[in-house]
């Protein structure tokens, strides 16, 4: 266009010819721009296909012909019996002969440094992985025999990876629960601290969340996940760093309400935060994949302080 102005001034082309050239240039370049967009979408489609293909090729949790033991309600006795475990494609074992027993209604904290294996305990208890050796038992039954649906309905869990879905706050709390009543959802939200921020929004529990809870703070996401774990009133609560993203005041309030709510249930808290030790009576310290200490928290003060020195990455 700039060069065309000089050509018009020199009388070599007309104004109409310049305008026609600009129009034709735009039409010639438009398909190239669309081609670039198409290539971008192709790469996105290929990435999505690979993810879906990996999901479809994964081993089924319910293989055809497999029969499970139905346990609609569990008492909450948890036992690790000489459990050894290594993650796929890892040469170093995450757990090495871990053994302990937690009685129904007992309140226990599992502590350890980064990479010690304490979060691996949670994943094995939920059946997300199977031990290489030994057994994980609930109510004296190997969890590999228990129907996975029954197992997870009886264990309310909060893991470090917070997963929220596109939907309302109510739907994110109630997902996985069997026909939850509004009263159950509201009570779980109150205990977890969801009520504190939802009550101020005009949409309330119908507030729409983006995928993975985009737009919410880390503490708000954790509160919704904790409410999800509580809504079914499971006999076992498994909480892995449930308040790590909350501010001090919110954490204090949640702990106070949890202490009352956990009465009569088996509570397993995996943490490096000493504030959560108010919820428990017993401490198990995991060191390098083994049980380094196990006993009443009052006699394990030195060990717990040492174990609480790092953040979890196991």
Language-model regions, residue ranges each:
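Transmembrane alpha-helix boundary and packing residues in multipass membrane permease domains
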Residues: 2-6, 50, 241
């Amino acid at each position: 266009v700039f060069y065309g102005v000089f050509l018009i001034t020199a009388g070599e082309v007309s104004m109409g010819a310049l305008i026609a050239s600009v129009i034709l240039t735009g039409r010639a370049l438009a398909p190239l721009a669309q081609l670039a967009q198409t290539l971008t979408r192709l790469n996105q489609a290929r990435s999505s296909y690979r993810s879906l293909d990996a999901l479809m090729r994964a081993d089924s949790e319910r293989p055809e012909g497999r029969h499970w033991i139905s346990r609609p309600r569990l008492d909450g006795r948890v036992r690790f019996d000489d459990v050894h475990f290594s993650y796929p494609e890892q040469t170093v074992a995450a757990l090495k002969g871990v053994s302990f027993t937690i009685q129904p209604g007992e309140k226990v904290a599992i502590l350890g440094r980064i990479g010690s294996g304490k979060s691996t305990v949670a994943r094995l208890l939920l059946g997300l992985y199977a031990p290489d050796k030994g057994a994980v038992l609930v109510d004296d039954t190997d969890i590999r025999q228990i129907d996975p649906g029954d197992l997870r309905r009886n264990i309310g869990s909060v893991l470090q990876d917070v997963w929220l879905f596109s939907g309302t706050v109510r739907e994110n709390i109630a997902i996985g629960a069997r026909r939850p009543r509004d009263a159950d959802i509201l009570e779980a939200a109150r205990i977890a601290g969801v009520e504190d921020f939802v009550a101020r929004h005009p949409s309330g529990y119908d507030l729409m969340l983006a995928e993975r809870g985009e737009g919410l703070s880390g503490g708000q996401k954790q509160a919704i996940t904790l409410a999800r774990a509580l809504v079914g009133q499971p006999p076992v609560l498994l909480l892995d760093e449930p308040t790590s993203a909350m501010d001090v005041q919110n954490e204090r309030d949640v702990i106070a309400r949890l202490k009352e709510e956990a009465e009569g249930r088996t509570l397993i808290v995996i943490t490096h935060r000493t504030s959560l030790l108010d919820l428990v009576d017993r401490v198990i310290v995991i060191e390098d994949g083994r049980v380094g200490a196990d006993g009443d928290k009052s006699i394990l003060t030195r060990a717990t302080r040492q174990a609480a020195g790092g953040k979890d990455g196991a």
